[in-house]
């Protein structure tokens, strides 16, 4: 794997599917929303496959799959989902194995750490607090922190700006095609975890610069030089 001499100083990390297995919380909230509309629950894997592009997209896909569009107003459904998700957020999911050890190792080695997620701040903040992961992170860029969300590169640039580092000195860790697209647009390397919500083809099909079995494996990949993004 190619490397360059500029050291990586910032590690930007996705939340859902990368740090936390939040699918149980999200699927439960989505199916509670469907129940409110008198619709049967969708399979777990179906709803989990919609995670990663923000709540409005997830709710839209759920409504379409359940055959509720255009009868149900999207805004009403999003509000209903948020109400249920506030109750399930951080209650059913769990931190992936190796995440805390990996974050601690990165912090100990001097890397600046930020979470960059499409999850709204009102949901991301309590989830990071409930899981204890907020103690490792200097910065949170949520889905509504700025006008753009991943796969737009601007959230990655914004995170680096808040960390006071050049974007070129960052590396993104995620689990989906959204993360790969954002990193490519920002011109930085991207590592994908082998678990998470990559979709039917799995993470190997998404063209990341490296695949991680665990976040604990990341420090070794960043030492002594940063990963170079694929051409």
UniProtKB/Swiss-Prot annotation:
<dbReference type="GO" id="GO:0006281">
    <property type="term" value="P:DNA repair"/>
</dbReference>
<feature type="binding site">
    <location>
        <position position="14"/>
    </location>
    <ligand>
        <name>Mg(2+)</name>
    </ligand>
</feature>
<feature type="binding site">
    <location>
        <position position="175"/>
    </location>
    <ligand>
        <name>Mg(2+)</name>
    </ligand>
</feature>
<dbReference type="Pfam" id="PF13419">
    <property type="entry name" value="HAD_2"/>
</dbReference>
<keyword id="KW-0113">Calvin cycle</keyword>
<dbReference type="InterPro" id="IPR036412">
    <property type="entry name" value="HAD-like_sf"/>
</dbReference>
<keyword id="KW-0460">Magnesium</keyword>
<dbReference type="GO" id="GO:0046295">
    <property type="term" value="P:glycolate biosynthetic process"/>
</dbReference>
<dbReference type="InterPro" id="IPR023214">
    <property type="entry name" value="HAD_sf"/>
</dbReference>
<dbReference type="GO" id="GO:0008967">
    <property type="term" value="F:phosphoglycolate phosphatase activity"/>
</dbReference>
<comment type="function">
    <text>Specifically catalyzes the dephosphorylation of 2-phosphoglycolate. Is involved in the dissimilation of the intracellular 2-phosphoglycolate formed during the DNA repair of 3'-phosphoglycolate ends, a major class of DNA lesions induced by oxidative stress.</text>
</comment>
<protein>
    <recommendedName>
        <fullName>Phosphoglycolate phosphatase, chromosomal</fullName>
        <ecNumber>3.1.3.18</ecNumber>
    </recommendedName>
</protein>
<keyword id="KW-0378">Hydrolase</keyword>
<comment type="pathway">
    <text>Organic acid metabolism; glycolate biosynthesis; glycolate from 2-phosphoglycolate: step 1/1.</text>
</comment>
<comment type="subunit">
    <text>Homotrimer.</text>
</comment>
<dbReference type="GO" id="GO:0005829">
    <property type="term" value="C:cytosol"/>
</dbReference>
<dbReference type="InterPro" id="IPR041492">
    <property type="entry name" value="HAD_2"/>
</dbReference>
<feature type="active site" description="Nucleophile">
    <location>
        <position position="14"/>
    </location>
</feature>
<dbReference type="InterPro" id="IPR006439">
    <property type="entry name" value="HAD-SF_hydro_IA"/>
</dbReference>
<dbReference type="InterPro" id="IPR037512">
    <property type="entry name" value="PGPase_prok"/>
</dbReference>
<dbReference type="InterPro" id="IPR050155">
    <property type="entry name" value="HAD-like_hydrolase_sf"/>
</dbReference>
<dbReference type="InterPro" id="IPR023198">
    <property type="entry name" value="PGP-like_dom2"/>
</dbReference>
<comment type="similarity">
    <text>Belongs to the HAD-like hydrolase superfamily. CbbY/CbbZ/Gph/YieH family.</text>
</comment>
<keyword id="KW-0119">Carbohydrate metabolism</keyword>
<feature type="binding site">
    <location>
        <position position="16"/>
    </location>
    <ligand>
        <name>Mg(2+)</name>
    </ligand>
</feature>
<keyword id="KW-0479">Metal-binding</keyword>
<dbReference type="GO" id="GO:0019253">
    <property type="term" value="P:reductive pentose-phosphate cycle"/>
</dbReference>
<dbReference type="GO" id="GO:0046872">
    <property type="term" value="F:metal ion binding"/>
</dbReference>
